A protein has these predicted regions:
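Short pre-active-site segment immediately N-terminal to the catalytic Zn-binding motif
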Residues: 102-119, 272-278
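Well-ordered beta-sheet/strand-loop patches within structured domains
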Residues: 154-158, 171-254, 260-262, 326-422
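Active-site His/Glu-centered metal-binding helix of metallohydrolases
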Residues: 120-129, 285
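Long, internal scaffold/assembly segments composed of regular secondary structure
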Residues: 231-330, 334-335, 339
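Fold-level signature of zinc-dependent metallopeptidase catalytic domains
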Residues: 17-21, 107-110, 142, 148, ...
Length: 510
């Protein structure tokens, strides 16, 4: 058997197509699996589906899930993708992979055998092993039950459409989707979700929720002197950032079926929470392993030069990083940065320089495979960059930082890729992947339980960044769910409170 560091050439080469058959896919998959085991890639069982370009667009529109509940936004996304694809303005992914157990990978039937092999290595072993082993996915998602839960969600929402009308359900989903990013439990692990459990608990949950809402909003009159100190306290006692959860539990006018739909959207949002924080790592890990596995097969003599030329052409396009002044520049390519960093970690372990030993004394000269698995398991994009971004990668990418201070009428280049700027570049870049800096900090601050039942939201700006003008439309969705007046406040740097919006607006006011 070939080892990682010493491989013997094998004269038996696999067919390089370009056409493929299912039998040939099985042969390639067996070889990829053999090599993946040499590198200790621990994966879920995988399920490979070969689909057409139109089916791939359909998967695009339903956020990559094999099944989903009906909503107009998915159809809009499909039409948009189809139009761009047919006019040559947008390509399609060669694959889509789903964090489930078994891990489902969709491959395009138009792919050549080379691209099918690349995608199997990328998705079935790269992404798959990341889903199974990264701490965020282990802690915050349950791969074994997501498909079952989506089946439950589609069935339930379809039944609601039949019972209460498509328009009524659609309006509710519109509001839930508008607040989807504010439906995540970030500090406690969510309960596992499954089709059987949801069906069993649904009725009891509906009854319990309604009883709790009735208790909260009981309207029996009390004399003023009977008020206690506890009743005068602010509700909720602490600010709440999970808006959908708060609405599900406390909105006065929502019916039990509406609360269940809020819960469904909230659970789906929770499922995607880790993916938003690991794009660089996830894509970098998958790219590193498709590159390593296919090069391993070439070194063994299993694949041809023609196969490698096609593979390297595609790989090079994937990891290309346009310069900042290119018309094609749209930010840092997560494939490029992630791949470069994992490659660099391997280099630091195998052939460290004096610079590497100074910056990374714990990993310089260590076992590269063990270090890579450690980095994959225990970090997210923000901490991964903060921990492992090396001066060499900063120089290769020619990173520099631009300071855009709203209090000044100029931009400042505050750091470049040199000795004085390395740490600032690393800190600034890692902070760009901190979700707390990317999404507005809006929390439920107060509910007037004994007055007009109004809800107060409070926005705390990051670096004095104002809210988008679309806040008025979003506030309408909050009002639809809450059922009473909603106010949006801003807490300024000096501690003062400013009223930004009120929904519905009052005459002579906002």
């Amino acid at each position: 058997m070939a080892t990682i560091d010493s491989m013997n050439k094998d004269t038996t080469r696999l067919s390089d197509g370009p056409d493929w058959t299912f039998d040939l896919l099985d042969v390639y998959l067996a070889e990829i699996d053999r090599v993946a085991k040499l590198y200790r890639l621990d994966t879920y069982p995988h399920q490979i589906e070969v689909i057409t370009s139109e089916q791939m667009m359909d998967a695009y529109s339903s956020v990559g899930m094999p099944i989903n509940y009906p909503h107009w936004s998915f159809g809009k996304k499909f039409i948009e993708t189809e139009r761009l694809y047919k006019h040559g303005q947008q390509g399609l992914a060669y694959e889509i992979v789903i964090n489930s157990n078994p891990c489902i990978a969709y491959l395009m039937e138009e792919n050549t055998i080379t691209m099918q092999a690349l995608m199997m290595a990328h998705a079935c072993y790269g992404h798959n092993s990341f889903f199974k082993n990264n701490y965020l996915f282990r802690s915050w998602t349950d791969a074994s039950s997501i498909v079952d839960y989506l089946i439950f969600a589609r069935k339930y929402i379809t039944e609601c459409e039949e019972r209460y009308g498509v328009d009524e359900v659609e309006r509710l989903l519109d509001s839930c989707h508008a607040l989807m990013n504010y439906g995540v439990d970030r500090y406690k692990r969510p309960q596992k979700i499954s089709l059987q459990e949801e069906k069993a608990r649904q009725k009891s949950r509906e009854e319990y929720l309604q009883s709790q809402v009735n208790m909260l909003w009981r309207t029996l009159p009390k004399r003023e002197e009977e008020k206690t100190v506890a009743e005068a306290r602010r509700y909720p006692s602490e600010p709440q950032e999970n808006l959908l959860y708060f609405m599900e539990k406390n909105a006065p006018l929502l019916e039990s079926w509406q609360r269940e739909i809020l819960r469904i959207v909230r659970k789906v949002s929770q499922y995607f929470y880790p993916q938003k924080q690991t794009q660089v790592m996830n894509e970098g890990w998958a790219t590193f392993w498709h590159y390593t596995i296919l090069n391993h097969l070439y070194d063994e003599g299993k694949v041809t030069e023609r196969f490698m030329l096609e593979f390297l052409h595609s790989h090079t396009n994937v990891v290309f990083q346009p310069p900042y002044n290119s018309p094609w520049y749209s930010g840092i390519n997560p494939y490029a940065l992630g791949f470069a960093m994992f490659q660099d970690i391997k280099r630091i372990c195998q052939s460290p320089t004096e610079e590497d030993k100074y910056w990374f004394p714990d990993i310089a000269g260590s076992d590269w495979l063990e270090t890579l698995h450690f980095a994959m398991r225990d970090f997210k994009d923000e901490s991964f960059i903060s921990q492992f971004l090396s001066p060499k990668v900063m120089r290769d990418f020619r990173f520099f930082t631009v300071l855009d201070d709203d209090r000044h009428n100029y931009l400042e280049i505050s750091a470049i890729h040199n000795e004085e700027g390395y740490r600032e570049i690393r800190n600034r870049l890692s902070s760009q992947y901190n979700l707390s800096n990317l999404e507005p900090n809006i929390q439920i601050w107060n509910v007037d339980l004994r007055g007009d039942r109004s809800l107060t939201l409070r926005y705390i700006p990051h670096n004095r960044a104002p809210l988008d003008r679309g806040r008025k439309e979003v506030l309408k969705h909050v009002h639809r769910l809450w059922g009473f007046d909603v106010m949006l406040e801003q807490q300024n740097e000096d501690g003062s409170i400013e009223l930004l919006e009120r929904c519905p607006p009052r005459m002579g006011n906002l």
